[in-house]
Amino acid sequence: MRPPRRKGAGRSGALGDILHEPSVRQKVTAMPQTDQNRAREPRQRSHASAFAPDLAVKVEAAASPLSSPSGTPRQVAAEPRTAKHLQAGKPDEPRRATAGAGPGRAEASPPQLDAEAFAANLTRLAEETARASKAYLKPQLAGESSPWVNAEVGEIARTLGEVAERWMAEPQRALEAQTRLTSGLIGLWADALRRFEGEEVPPARPPDPADRRFKDPAWKQNPFYDFLRQSYVHTAQWAEDMVREAKDMDPHTRHKAQFYVRQLAAALSPSNFVALNPELIRQTIEQNGANLVRGAQMLAEDVEAGGGELKIRQTDTRTFEVGVNLATTPGKVVLRNDLIELIQYAPTTEMVLRRPLLIVPPWINKFYILDLNPEKSFIRWAVAQGLTVFVISWVNPDTRHADKGFDAYMREGIFAALHAIEEATGERKVSAVGYCVGGTLLSTTLAYMAAKGDRRIESATLLATQVDFKHAGDLQVFVDEKQVRAVEDEMRSHGFLDGKRMALAFNMLRPNDLIWRYMVDVYLKGKAPMAFDLLFWNSDSTRMPAVNHSFYLRNCYLENNLTKGRMVIDGVTLDLGRVTVPVYNLAAKEDHIAPALSTFEGSRHFGGEVRYVMAGSGHIAGVINPPTHQKYQYWTGGPVGDSFQGWVERAEEHKGSWWPDWFAWIERQASERVAARIPGGSKFMELEDAPGSYVKVKS
């Protein structure tokens, strides 16, 4: 009979705040020592044992021991199975034999490796690794591989090479820096030797409770692994210091170097290697390597699914389906053109605000981040407040859309939606919401409309939106003239930028949570990830049309033309100062994509009243924060002043969600209510039910 699975698996991470469950902590057990061992222990532990600590003594067991004193059951991985079989529990699970609790009962022996089973699993591991290698090499051999990876590696080498050059120009400072590194490591090793002797030594670098990589108690309780952890932290901090202290570096190069050092530090963590991670060693022994076989199976499947590139498995994608258990707010598609489907949502109140609401989501992701499920849906909540909600669903572009630029997204996106809303409701004036790059497009459109005297948008809400890119955060590391040209060259061959590129860029902003966590849990522990709607959305990437994306990179990130009055759309030079409609500008305190400072600076370029609000958490969780969850907080501080720091100091904190504050602001703009409207009205054919077809197209 198969024993039950262990509990304690951490919840999947997200693009916003990552929630972790605490590791299971159990008492450390050790093998009994003989008198002979005890007699010679002190001298040996200061030499050989210190370098090769006995796992049975010094590695804490995270779960019940694998075997009883009578022996260890053999485990050999089954024939190749799909991820579906893996998650269903069909592969062999380790049998956990534990000692009874009665008097005179011996304590369970530590995990023992079954050599025959381990050898069989190593054979299977080699087969699955070869399968993954074959999938990786297939596009390389066919001449279809993207040059992006090699270009990025070259950029990393060039950037870090500049740091090295600065230090080589100052040999004395370089020697002092090297001395700091080596003396720190020697001190840590001396502390480890004292701990091996049984002395209590406080760690020079205490564990960070928020760092889940080192949650296993062995990282703290075992002197060898504690030395390994502290040495890693010490070296990583030293590398960051080297970048920060390098002289005569321009800010952009230093920023890139800091970013790349963080990537390398995340990749080289000892927790990422089977031979250095006590939890992985323990699980591999307990399962005779079957965990590695399962992980290699999933690795091969994910490289195949990525067309030769690893598409990291962050969640169980089979659990979700757009339109079934995601994006389920009732509504109708009332307009479709080459770029958008416009969705009008069905009312749930008898009376609604006269002024309709148009939501312009980002096209870098899909709109259903605003409609994940009934409990998290901003769209459903807005409908429940009595708003007639229209949402643009952008096409997932292909080669046919290569020449669609920012101007096309304005005309065929926002302007087409405004015309359809007027036809469907009879209302010419609307309130508009823009999220992320959707907010940048909305701001651009407002400046264009101001130049043309068009006042159809009476108020604007910007969610985590940048219009001033001077402080644009870590995404700036991917944008300089050389890198933009490389992206343009890549897009030229297909007419679009593959969604995998943007997905990887976003994952690199949080490498420990969104890359290496899954490399370890999925591909080394062999655990199929949990179902998590937010991570499903995160992996449901979209492509970007070549002309549009080039315009965005150059005019926003590279040249910051919108706030400098140099952006031109359809021959019109744009000036945000001419935008006088009320603006509700929401930032997120921990946003790593549109930093709060960046969005604050953008507020000062508009010509009308701006209500700047800062939500707790990050780019996603700060925005998608329903009032019923009673999570986080938001700050209001009145008009935008001279400095962001000054605004923060005088801001007033409010518990919970910003959504009610926003709706009160919307209602103050135009509070008149009318009878609820049926989607499409009398002038539109209902093309299909929400969420439509465009959102279901995969990259």
Predicted regions and their residues:
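Amphipathic, low-complexity, repeat-rich surface-exposed segments
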Residues: 2-7, 13-341, 352-353, 390, ...
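Short beta-strand/loop motif that positions the catalytic acidic residue
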Residues: 585-587
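Short alpha-helix in the alpha/beta-hydrolase fold that links the catalytic acid
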Residues: 595-605
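Short beta-strand element of the alpha/beta-hydrolase
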Residues: 353-362
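Alpha/beta-hydrolase active-site loop
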Residues: 403-424
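Alpha/beta-hydrolase-fold enzymes
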Residues: 248-283, 423, 427, 445-549, ...
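Alpha/beta-hydrolase fold nucleophile elbow
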Residues: 425-437
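Short amphipathic alpha-helix adjacent to the substrate-entry channel of hydrolases
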Residues: 371-388
